[in-house]
Amino acid sequence: NYERRWKVSWFLRESNAMVPAAIAPRLSLDNQPDDFNGKSILVIAEQGVGDQIMFSSILPDLVSRASKVTFVSVPKPMALFKASFPTVDFIPPLPSLRIGAFDKVIALGSLAYAFRNRLEDFPGAPYLRPRDDVIEAWKARLGPKTTRLRVGLSWQGGTDRTSGQKRSI
C-alpha cells in the first residue's frame, strides 16, 4: 500500500532493522519540497543498497533546496554516491552521530513523497557517475571498444526476511 508507507508508525515497524533507535523519533516522513528550504538535512538510508541507488535519484532535488545535505549510508555504494553527488556529505553509520545538529532527519525513501508524485517529476536523466579511475580501470579490463554491445548484470535482491534469494540473478 503506497499511501500507508508514509505513516510513521508503519514505516518504523517495517524498517526497524535499518533505522537506529536513537534516530527514529526524529524522522520526518510527510514533507513537502518547501519544508527543506534552507535547512540542514540528515538523510538515513533505511533500505538495501539497490533501493538506495534508486532513491538517490531524488538527492539533486533535495540539494537544490537544502542548505546542507548529509547522507548516512553503508560503505558499499559510498564511492559511487560521492562521485555522483559531490555536494552531499556521505558518512557511514556512526554510533556517535549528533542528530541534533540537523534541522530535519528524513529516510531516503521518504523523499519520494515530497519530490516524486507524478510521472513528470522524474527527470529522466542519468544521475550516477562513476569516478574517472573506475572508468579507466574498466576500459583497461575490457579492452578496445568494439561495435558489439557489452552488457554485464549482477543483482542480489532483498534479504532472507524478504525472500531475497528469489529476487537475485
Residue ranges and their predicted role:
Residues 1-169:
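Alpha-helical solenoid repeat scaffolds of the TPR/TPR-like class and their adjacent stem/linker regions
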